[in-house]
Every structure is written in structure tokens, then in C-alpha cells.
Regions:
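Pre-Walker A adenine-sensing motif
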Residues: 2-15
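Hydrophobic anchor at the beta1->P-loop junction of P-loop NTPases
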Residues: 23
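Conserved lysine of the Walker
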Residues: 31
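Hydrophobic positions on the alpha1 helix immediately C-terminal to the Walker A/P-loop
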Residues: 34
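Short glycine-rich substrate-engagement loop in P-loop NTPases that contacts/grips substrate
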Residues: 55-80
Length: 226
């Protein structure tokens, strides 16, 4: 499924003054999928590391910020031979490894040739708990649920999406019935990727509601844990 944020990631990749990037966003908005898809599409290799229940990798960053040592550990953990020019390093669930978040400063200052993206669903909460943040040493990108144009693309309605981009209102008005139909479905699904994908495949409103309920329970659980 197409996410417009992919274009912003590509712009980041091409920047001459690129810094490590932190992908911000709530749970279930598709951060992990986007990072992996970006790596698969635009890099020869992706070294993916998740810090969720991964004490070994958390300990790697707790030791010190020697980038050469860190890269050697990432090589072994990911099973990927990391080379700066063609490897995307993905550090997922980074809120579970405060020192890994802090290490982005050293990637920026001492090893800017590496392409590093980090993400964490509860990162905003973690920062409020006093975790050190690499101010000025990272690029930021916010990811949200599907917007209406992305939803149209997911429903294989690229023609309708392209018409919106032209802002040709006579053309758009000519297909107002189609836009209203899909807008109602967009409002119903809400734009979360798992919901959109299920609706794309099955058009089952009961399934949509069940997935939405599961996501709400996850959010409630997160809130109760804080």
C-alpha cells in the first residue's frame, strides 16, 4: 500500500546533510512496515533491530557509544553486513533502549555516512520520563493514519486520487458520487493501516469493527500502564 511519507523518506536519503531520522507516530500507524518497505525499495540491504524484549541489544548501547563496536554488534544481530553506502539501519521500539536513542547523537557527529532510522510507539511518553534526547542531532518525521488520498490508492482508485491532486474541481465534481462513497468508507475505517488493509481485501464491515476494537484495547492497555 502506498504511503506518501515514503517520498519524504526518499528526500531524507538524498540529503547531503542527512542526520539520523526518528520516525514519530502512535501505535499501529505503520511505522515498522514503512521503515522495512523503505529499506527494501531503496537500499540493497536493511539491518533491522527491535529493542522489544531484546536485553542483549539494549546492553550493547549501555556499554559506550563506540560506533565501530556498535556496528559490529548490529551486523551480528541483524545478520546483515552493514556498509554505509547501501544499508539502512532500522532501530525499532527504541523507547526500550534509552542509550540507543542517545547514540543517534554520535552517529550524527562521528559516523554521518550511516543511514539510520529509529522509531518507537511510546517515544513521546519515554521522553517525558527523562530519557536523554539528541537535540539538534536528528531529523524528525511524523507518521499518521492513512489520509483520504492514501485510502483511495489502497482501494485501487488511483484515478480518483490523481484527480484530487490536479484540483480540477469540474472533473472532481463529475465523480462526486464515487468520492462520497469512498469518503463514507474512509470515515468508517478510520485510516489505521491494519483496518484499511482488511477492508481492501474483504470489504467486511464487521471485521473492520473488530480490528478497531482490538486497537482501542491496545491503546487502553498502554494508558493503564503509564
Amino acid at each position: 500500500m502506498r504511503r506518501f511519507a515514503m517520498d519524504k523518506l526518499l528526500d531524507w536519503k538524498k540529503k547531503s546533510n542527512r542526520k539520523p531520522l526518528i520516525l514519530m507516530g502512535a501505535r499501529q500507524v505503520g511505522k515498522t512496515w514503512l521503515m522495512k518497505e523503505f529499506g527494501k525499495t531503496y537500499y540493497e540491504k536493511t539491518a533491522y533491530i527491535s529493542f522489544y524484549n531484546n536485553q542483549r541489544m539494549q546492553a550493547v548501547f549501555d556499554t559506550d557509544f563506540d560506533i565501530k563496536r556498535i556496528i559490529m554488534n548490529l551486523n551480528i544481530e541483524s545478520g546483515v553486513a552493514i556498509t554505509p553506502e547501501n544499508t539502512l539501519i532500522v532501530l525499532d521500539e527504541i523507547q526500550n533502549a534509552p542509550k540507543a536513542l542517545e547514540s543517534l547523537k554520535y552517529f550524527c557527529e562521528e559516523a554521518p555516512e550511516y543511514h539510520v532510522i529509529a522509531a518507537g510507539s511510546l517515544l513521546g511518553v519515554a521522553l517525558h520520563e527523562g530519557i536523554s534526547y539528541p537535540v539538534g542531532k536528528v531529523d524528525l518525521l511524523d507518521l499518521y493514519p492513512f489520509n483520504f488520498r492514501e485510502f483511495l490508492c489502497a482501494m485501487d482508485e488511483e484515478g480518483l486520487e490523481s484527480a484530487l491532486e490536479t484540483k480540477d474541481y469540474n472533473l472532481i465534481d463529475n465523480f462526486s458520487d464515487k468520492y462520497l462513497f469512498w469518503l463514507k468508507n474512509y470515515y468508517y475505517t478510520g485510516g489505521m493501516p491494519a483496518v484499511v488493509d482488511a477492508f481492501r481485501l474483504n470489504k467486511d464491515y464487521a471485521e473492520v469493527r473488530q480490528i478497531q476494537s482490538d486497537i482501542c484495547l491496545l491503546y487502553t492497555s498502554d494508558a493503564a500502564d503509564e
